[in-house]
Structure formats: C-alpha cells, structure tokens
From Swiss-Prot:
<dbReference type="Pfam" id="PF00970">
    <property type="entry name" value="FAD_binding_6"/>
</dbReference>
<dbReference type="InterPro" id="IPR012675">
    <property type="entry name" value="Beta-grasp_dom_sf"/>
</dbReference>
<dbReference type="GO" id="GO:0018963">
    <property type="term" value="P:phthalate metabolic process"/>
</dbReference>
<dbReference type="InterPro" id="IPR001433">
    <property type="entry name" value="OxRdtase_FAD/NAD-bd"/>
</dbReference>
<keyword id="KW-0560">Oxidoreductase</keyword>
<dbReference type="GO" id="GO:0051537">
    <property type="term" value="F:2 iron, 2 sulfur cluster binding"/>
</dbReference>
<dbReference type="InterPro" id="IPR036010">
    <property type="entry name" value="2Fe-2S_ferredoxin-like_sf"/>
</dbReference>
<dbReference type="GO" id="GO:0070402">
    <property type="term" value="F:NADPH binding"/>
</dbReference>
<dbReference type="InterPro" id="IPR008333">
    <property type="entry name" value="Cbr1-like_FAD-bd_dom"/>
</dbReference>
<keyword id="KW-0520">NAD</keyword>
<keyword id="KW-0411">Iron-sulfur</keyword>
<keyword id="KW-0479">Metal-binding</keyword>
<dbReference type="Pfam" id="PF00175">
    <property type="entry name" value="NAD_binding_1"/>
</dbReference>
<keyword id="KW-0408">Iron</keyword>
<dbReference type="InterPro" id="IPR039261">
    <property type="entry name" value="FNR_nucleotide-bd"/>
</dbReference>
<dbReference type="Pfam" id="PF00111">
    <property type="entry name" value="Fer2"/>
</dbReference>
<dbReference type="InterPro" id="IPR050415">
    <property type="entry name" value="MRET"/>
</dbReference>
Length: 336
C-alpha cells in the first residue's frame, strides 16, 4: 500500500508507493527536493526524519557519514509508514516545465582526448527552458537513460551543449564517439535542484574535476550575462593540462570579472605548467584560501572529489549550508 509523505511546516503531502524511493515519489508528485547523484554518495538529499518509519530502497544505505544523527538520505529510503520529513528546501515544480525533444546533433568534436563536446539543436521553434547548473536525460533505445549537465547558459536556449567524458565501457561513451551531424537523440529536461542564488554577493569558489566543469561553465556564463559582480574563483582539476579543455571560457571570464581567479590543479607532476597547482583540488583549496566562513563553495565532480573538497571546506570554517555539490556518478541512474 502507498504511504503518505508530509513535508514539515507545509500543506504538502504526496504518496510513496512500495518499492519507490522517497525522492522519486516527491519528484513524481511535482515536488523538487535537493538532490544530485541519486546513489547515496553526495548527501544533497539528506533530510530530517521527524515521524514515521523508513526502509532501505533497493538495498541502498539510508544514511552516510554526511548525515546528522536524525537525517536520512531520501534517495536511499522508502516509506514503511506515513512519514514526516524536514528537507533543507523544497519547491513545487511547474508540471509544464519538463519537456522531451528529439534533438539533432549539430556538431561533435573532441575538446580533449577523452572528452566530446557535443552540440545539439532542438526542433524549429522549440526552446530548452532550464536554469544554470541543471541537467538532462538522454533516453537510449534499450530503455536506459544517462544524465549530463548542460554546459551552455539558459539564455542560449535554441540548443544544448554537453561535455561527455569517455568512460571505458560506458554505454553512452561508446555511442557519443560515433555520433555525427544530423543524428538524433531523445532528450528530456530539465532535472536537478538549483542551489546557487544569483543575488548572493559573497565570494564564490567553484571547484570542478574533469567534466564537472560543464555545469560550472553554465553557472558562470549565466552570472556574466546577468552582469553579477562578485569575487569568483575557479579551481579546476585534471590529471594533465589536456583535461583543462576550454581555455577560451577562462579568458572570457577574466575580461568580465577583473578580479576573477583561476587555479589549475594538476596531479601528473611530470606535465606541470609553471602557473598550476601541483596536486588535487582539495589541496589547492587549502593552499590558496584561509578561513571560508563567509564564502560559498560549489563543487562538481566524482563522489570522492566532492567528499574531499567538502571535508577541506568544513575544516576551513565553511558552513554546511554554504557547500553545494553536483556529484557525477556513472551508471544508469548516475549523473555524468
């Protein structure tokens, strides 16, 4: 039988079916809660459980080390009774906001030896409405789907740009290397919760690993379009310089924000530019910053990268609510 999920201090309630995660039930009901990886890694969907009982969803952990004692991961649990939750935020979704399109490949080039820069065009007269930092689903012929962040800003709405890393054996990684101009893809968007507030004037530190740069590019291009004046630092990590594949974007932001700061973090010490940081992105954060109490950190990358940056930022005084993560996980339900 279905159980009811009640959101604390609101009139919102929605059903959770047997075998359905609380997060999926909320999204199905048109209620957006914070989330990213949907695999129990990022901790974004952690919510206080006030009343009721939960059970594991598909064998996933209902808590991880990022959860406070009374918190549960909404992606990893299902309702075993009626429950009441207190998420960090929530909002009603516009039922007309999410659209499914047949998009055409406009161009497909290599931005790096293992990264495809895939540009898609929408049908004539159609526009992709999304917010900076959100992602889309690519529906594959076998019924599976893969998620990728939009790298273009929302005002460039006649098409979509994706940065696709080639994962050995990856389902879409194999497909993308064969795509040519005129081929079509079945896409659906937008997905993902929005954490950054455009009117927040505090210093912003963006940390990316590899193609975690894609959503950050969308965010920074959007801030530039809005003429937001803010102290912004980008720490972008890769094994070698070829992984930092879009220097033109860095050059543009330096012109928009004279105070813009860029730190390249390279882990392959045998191929090190003179001005790069030798080491991981969390090392770069600790080296180049002091107290982060009045900062905002937006981090995009693998679960391990996000966790290492979260730990470093917390050690440096960043408040938990000022750390925003977009976790890239592989597989059918992971966000790439």
């Amino acid at each position: 039988m279905n159980h009811q999920i009640h959101i604390h201090d609101s009139d919102i309630a929605f059903p959770c079916a047997p075998g359905q995660s609380v997060l999926d039930a909320a999204l199905q009901a048109g209620i957006e809660l914070p989330y990213s990886c949907r695999k129990g890694s990022c901790g974004n969907c952690a919510s206080t459980l006030l009343d009721g009982n939960i059970a594991s969803f598909n064998g996933m952990a209902v808590r991880n080390e990022l959860c406070a004692s009374e918190q549960v991961l909404l992606c990893g649990c299902t309702a075993a009774s009626d429950i009441r939750i207190h998420p960090s935020s929530f909002r009603r979704l516009d039922p007309e906001a999410r659209k499914r399109f047949t998009a055409k490949v406009y161009s497909n080039t290599l931005a790096a030896p293992d990264v495809s820069l895939l540009r898609l065009r929408l049908p004539v007269g159609k526009r992709a409405k999304f917010e900076a930092g959100q992602y889309l689903l690519i529906h594959l012929d076998d019924g599976e789907s893969r998620s990728y962040s939009m790298a273009n800003p929302p005002h460039e709405s006649d098409g979509i740009t994706l940065h696709v890393r080639h994962v050995p054996g990856g389902r879409f990684s194999t497909i993308v290397q064969q795509l040519k101009s005129g081929d079509t893809l079945d896409i659906e968007l937008p997905f993902g919760s929005i954490a950054l507030k455009p009117d927040d004037a505090r210093p912003l530190i963006c940390v990316a690993g590899g193609t975690g740069f894609a959503p950050i590019k969308s965010v920074l291009d959007d801030l530039a379009k809005r003429k937001v004046q803010r102290d912004i630092t980008l720490i972008w990590g890769a094994r070698n310089p070829s992984g930092l594949y879009l220097p033109s974007a860095i050059d543009k932001w330096r012109k928009v924000w004279p105070q813009f700061r860029y730190i390249a973090a390279i882990t392959d010490l045998g191929d090190m530019p003179a001005d790069a940081h030798a080491g991981r992105v969390d090392d770069a954060l600790r080296t180049h910053f002091g107290n982060l109490h009045d900062h905002v950190v937006h981090c995009c990358g693998s679960p391990a990268l996000v966790q290492s940056v979260r730990t470093a930022a917390s050690d440096m005084g960043l408040l938990a609510q000022d750390f925003h993560a977009d976790v890239f996980a592989t597989g059918p339900t992971g966000h790439h």
